[in-house]
Structure formats: C-alpha cells, structure tokens
Amino acid sequence: DQRLRMKNAHLLLSFNAADALVTPTYFQRDTLPIWAHPITEVIHDGIDTQRVAPNPTANLTLNPSMPPLQVGDEVITFVNRNLEPCRGFHTFMRALPALLADRPKAQVVIVGGESVSYGRLPTDFPNWKAALLAEVGEQLDLSRVHFVGNISYAAFLSLLQISAVHVYLTYPFVLSWSLL
C-alpha cells in the first residue's frame, strides 16, 4: 500500500499543480481523484476516418509461412502492443482451440511484442506467448495461428481491413493505442 502511494505521489502532485487536465475517456477521468474532475476535460484522441476506412481491395502477406490474406477471407485478428494478460491475451489463447474447431477455414493473426507493458513476465517462461503456447499449443493447428510480432501501421490498417472478426479484450482501462 505504501509502495503504491509512493508510485502515485508524483501524479497527485502534478494534478494539484495543474490548471487543466486532459484525458481521452470518461472512464479514465473517473479514475482521477474527485477533486481533479472540475479541471479535467475529456477529449478523445480521434481517428483519421479518411485513412482508417474499409478497403474492398485490401490484401496482406506478413511472412512467407502464412497464406496471403484478403477481404472475404475468414481472418480473426488480435492486436496488442505486447501480448500479456492485462490486454486479454491469456483469454484469447485459451479460447482458440474451440474457436479453430468451430471455424475450420479461419486464419488467426496475432500482432504484438513478447515483452510486457502493464504487468510482469511469467515466472516460469520467458514471455506470455511461450507460457500460453505451453498451456494450449498442442491443441492448436499452428499452421492457422500466425504470430507476426509488431508490424508497421500500414500493415496494421490492411490487417484490420481484411479482418472478419477483430477480438479486443482488456480489463477496464482505456482504449488501447494499438487499436487507434
């Protein structure tokens, strides 16, 4: 408890010294101390809807081991900056065996690094990808599950444009920058 208070002290001091605060969501504003609400404006980060828009001719090949993908293919996407429990990676991986069994034509593309952004690495594995593959990997057809690491923003947009289903899991938090 004292350690957490110390970690938050600089934020509270900064809030107290501020004339105005900006946050992208009401949820995030509501996590601030009540006394900070009157000086807090909620302004969403915004999305460039000219650039982030459907493209019926979108296609993508991210690496030689996966098939070329295009609009109309049964593509399921999961994107995080880093693959970790705070962003639902463990839930997604545990759901994959049943999902792939129910959808025999589906290709799954998983985007994200192998470090952590919000939590800790697992104790018995080098990263959460390795931990979850140890748990469910034998139940997966890995020729249909593609871990592509971090990708360029242009590739990310194409991936979302061809995605039939984009899975976004997170604990109550803010909308992930990897989704914007």
Give the predicted meaning of each segment.
Residues G112-V116, R120-A154:
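Nucleotide-activated donor-binding/catalytic signature segment of Leloir-type glycosyltransferases, i.e.
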Residues L83, L169-L180:
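Nucleotide-sugar-dependent
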Residues F27, G46:
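Carbohydrate-associated surface elements
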Residues V22, P64-R87, M93-L96, V108-V109:
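Conserved donor-binding/catalytic core segment of Leloir-type glycosyltransferases
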Residues N150, S158-S163:
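Short alpha-helical donor nucleotide-sugar binding micro-motif in glycosyltransferases
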Residues I47-P67, S158:
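Acidic anion/phosphate-binding donor-loop and adjacent secondary structure
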Residues Q2-L21, E135:
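Membrane-proximal helix-turn-helix segments that form the acceptor-binding/catalytic region
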Residues D19, Q161-V174:
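Acidic donor-binding loop of glycosyltransferase active sites
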